[in-house]
Amino acid sequence: MKKNIKIATLVALLGVFVACSSESTPTYSELGSENYPQKFYVEYIPCNYGADWSPEAFNEDMLPGWQELLVEVDSKVVGAYGLVYENKPEDAQEDGFWQLVWNSKADAEEGWSTWEGYDKATEWNESTATILACGDKEDTFSFDAYVRRDFNSQGEFDAENFASDYQACSYNEGQGSQELISVIDDFEAWLDSENNLISQPYGYMVLAPDYETDEFDFIWGNFNQTAESRVLANENFLENGIIRFLVSSIAE
């Protein structure tokens, strides 16, 4: 039975590992396209520090081998990030997550099948577990991800180190994905208005769980360059009440 993912503030401490419309039938673009909205697949693998953990050990002794294996198996993974808690919840069993980004669920399933059937990948997992031990496919939290705008539209992100926070939401009675798209339409209009005072990189995405859970219907993720800029952005949101007002109309 899959445990619940902890919703909290996460920071991309380890850096980059690898180099919606209101219509009833919206079209989506793949990651890397200049067209939006984009729809893709995101996975969060729970990880725990080993006895030999350090950022240096990860970057020098663990990461290069993983990157080489990705080339060997011709992986379709688009990107990967290491996420750690800014303030770890007391009941969190993991120290952080290894985030994988794919263009589709089919690519993810193919990638996992190839990886788990590759002996050298198994050897790498075992040999690096004292640095960082991560779960397998069964432990992974998978989501359909939706992004309306370029993350660099409010300023260019440094993808090697940023701050993110995730809010779990449940639909109010009679509400669903179409109403959520309408909320996003209104939020987009607000972001482009003079009421938006965000002057630093900011992006957001919406995640729909691709696994059984009664805890929430979707997750709203906000991304800022630093924890300090996140505080300023949140103050802007609170002052205008924009996200809480819009989302609370369909979810809680």
For every predicted segment, state its role.
Residues 11-14:
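Short, linear, compositionally biased motifs with a strong N-terminal bias
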Residues 16-19:
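C-terminal motif of bacterial Sec signal peptides marking the signal peptidase cleavage site
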Residues 22-97, 101-126, 130-252:
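Short S/T/G/P-rich N-terminal loop/turn motif that feeds into the first structured element of a domain
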Residues 1-9:
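Bacterial N-terminal signal peptides that target proteins for export
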